[in-house]
Amino acid sequence: VRLGLDLLPHCDWIVIHDGARPCLDELILWRGLDAAQHTGAAIPVIPISDTLKQISDQHLVSATVDRNSFWATQTPQVFRREILVRAHQQITHHVTDDSGMLELLGYQVRVFDGETTNLKVTTPPDLKIAEELLRARAI
């Protein structure tokens, strides 16, 4: 992303999308652009449906975590350009996504509804599900 920002022509908004999420619906983009108007940064989230367990170094369950306060993050993430550029200039250590850099700098990141169909393809079963979703959309 950092290198892409240097090459991108001037614009007010940056939308970052993970290429491993091929089933993006256009409505998510519009929701993101709308949500980002409030704080300059917005990310799609979906509720976590699985039970979450905290595991010790000894591979034992040490706690069951209340999943109601946790959400899974997706892309596209939407940012006002100047905020994202500033974050990339000031944060040089690894973070898992661009919104994490803004959080470290004290920016508020607004959330909006993602979609379970906007899945991340990381395993062969994920690929089969994505293929079926895309095939169904083409009908």
Please report, for each region that a protein language model flagged, where it lies by residue.
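Active-site nucleotide-sugar/metal-binding loop of Leloir-type enzymes
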Residues: 2-13
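Short, well-ordered alpha-helices that flank and scaffold nucleotide-derived cofactor binding pockets
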Residues: 6, 34, 132-136
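Short beta-strand-to-loop acidic/aromatic patch adjacent to the donor-nucleotide binding site
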Residues: 11-21
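Glycine-rich "substrate-gating" loop/helix at the edge of Rossmann-like oxidoreductase active sites
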Residues: 20, 92, 116-119
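Conserved core of the sugar-phosphate nucleotidyltransferase
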Residues: 23-112, 139
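Hydrophobic helical membrane-anchoring modules
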Residues: 118-139
